[in-house]
Every structure is written in C-alpha cells, then in structure tokens.
A protein has these predicted regions:
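Bacterial Sec-dependent N-terminal signal peptides
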Residues: 1-25
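Pepsin/retropepsin-fold aspartyl endopeptidases
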Residues: 21-297
C-alpha cells in the first residue's frame, strides 16, 4: 500500500530491542496479504506487512474494539492510494507498543485510520518498513515465514537471482519492462508494494504517456473504500508479457489507473507491483546494498 505522512516528517520509529541472530516470524498469507501476528499494547493484532508503507498504522475499528485508552492524540495529513488526495487523520503519540516474536517496537507516532474497508476485516493495522529496514528480510510465502537477519550470507542467496534496485524513502523501486503488445513497451522503475493484494498496476501518467486509453479490449474498475483508499478507477487490460530485471513474470494481465490524485497518479514510478506477483517468489530484501533476491517458489 502506498502511504506517506506529510507532517511530522522528522519523527521516526524507535526499535527497543535488537539481536544478532535471525528472528523468525510466523505469518499468514490470506486474501493476497501477508499478516504478521503481533501484540499491540498486549492485545493480539494481525498487521499487514507492507513494503509500500513506512510507518506502523492501526485500524480505527480495531482500536475501538480493544477499548484502548490513548490520551496523547494529534493530527496529520496522509496520502492514500485513491484520488481524493491527502486526508486529515488522528495520530497516537508515543503510546503504542508492538511486539512481534519477542521483539518490541515503539513508534513515536501511529496513524489511526479506517483500514478494513480497503484491506478486509482481518486487518488490524499495517506494519511498515521503518522499524526493520536495517535488517535483511527474507519472505517465504509457501511456508508462511518472514525472517530478519543481521547480515546476508552466500548460503542464503543460493539459487536466487540478484536484482539491483533503488531505495527512496525506504520504498523499493525495481526495474520493470511491460510488453503490452507489439507496438507498446513500457520500461522504468516500479514500486514493490507487498501491502497491495493486486498484480501489476500502471500509474496514470504512464498510461497517458503510452496512450493506453486507445486499447479497446479492456474492463473498467472503480472502488470507493473510504479511509486511506479513497476513490480509485481504471481499466484492466491484456499484456503480452512482463519482466522484473531479467525474470519473466507469470501474468498476462495488468491494470492501469485513471486517477488524477494519490499515489497511482505519481510520476515517480511506472507501476505498482502487488502480491499477486510477489507470491510467485521466495524473496530477500537487502536495503543497505539496494538489492533484492528472487527465486521462483
């Protein structure tokens, strides 16, 4: 999911505990989302693992159901995926503690947002990348584990393909080529977004640049989820093939956005890539060296 805070930019997440050993998390892969099984202030919480987000977010319904008594509340502006633009939302300041597999994270602030209309009723919040981007992160969809390592060893990458990437504001941009048809090829950086349950979603500036509106065989879509999702619309089209680096993807469908605002109207990347693609692979994320490693699972 593509989310960013537009105020309080200097604040961050404090990692309370650290380890030199691999830390393994059991995850659930449901509805094309990765769920980390955590505790929030001592109460169970399923947080969506999201490489497209930076912070930890909590769902407003989850917070109400748990009867948390947070006292330090502020406000911030947050952009979402849809076309409504930034929205004012409440933030909890310094009172949230998240525990996962024995490790504790205490965000300096936590946005309180209406996530379930966008992600589903299983989602109690989002776990973004700021808290763990200093680690090597390995994700195994089939065996449903996510592991954090202090360093990358040659044994860990056996059988994987290394792909150099760009890291901007803890977001991962991967090199991508989309062959729409014999006349249209789209190449550039695409956002790695494990918070998305979709496949390849082409941004509206890229769609306009390549005249995708002229494709006649397409299916419209639109949603208005409320919360961070806002309103979003576009079309699903057939494509010939697509690659990440030199790795061919198993898909012959893509969507393109017609949004005028929001992250799908961004010119910073050509497309957003969600879990319908990433679940085809075992994955290792190496932020420090701007690399990811992929292996067909």
């Amino acid at each position: 999911m593509k989310l960013h805070i537009t105020t309080f930019a200097a604040l961050g997440l404090a990692l309370i505990s650290a380890t030199t050993n691999a830390q393994e998390h059991n995850i659930k892969y449901l509805g094309d989302h990765i769920y980390l099984q955590t505790e929030v202030n001592g109460k169970p919480a399923n947080l969506v693992f999201d490489t497209g987000a930076e912070l930890i977010y909590l769902d407003s319904t989850y917070v109400a159901d748990q009867n948390f008594n947070f006292k330090l509340i502020g406000n911030a502006m947050i952009d979402g995926a849809g076309s409504d633009g930034p929205a004012k939302t409440k933030i909890i300041i310094g009172e949230v503690t998240v525990t996962a597999s024995g490790k504790t994270y205490k965000p300096e602030f936590t946005p309180l947002v209406n996530l379930r209309p966008l992600l589903g009723n299983q989602a109690d919040g989002i776990f973004g990348m700021k808290a763990i981007s200093g680690k090597i992160i390995s994700i195994d969809y089939k065996n449903q584990t996510l592991s954090l390592h202090d360093k990358l060893t040659p044994q860990m990458t056996e059988g994987y393909t290394c792909i150099p990437v760009k890291i901007k504001n803890r977001k991962i941009l991967v090199p991508m080529t989309i062959n729409v048809n014999s006349q249209t090829t789209i190449s550039g950086d695409a956002l790695m977004d494990m918070g998305s349950g979709q496949g390849i979603e082409i941004t509206s500036p890229t769609a306009t640049k390549h005249s995708l509106d002229k494709i006649s065989d397409k299916t419209p879509f639109a949603f208005s989820s409320g919360g961070l999702g806002g309103k979003s619309a576009g079309y699903t089209i057939n494509i010939a093939n697509a690659n990440i680096g030199n790795i061919a993807l198993q898909t012959q469908k893509a969507a393109y956005s017609t949004d005028k605002k929001g992250s799908m109207a961004s010119a910073d990347y050509i497309a957003n890539i969600g879990n319908k693609i990433w679940s085809q692979f075992d994955i290792i994320l190496d932020f420090a060296n701007s690399k990811i490693y992929l292996r067909k699972n």
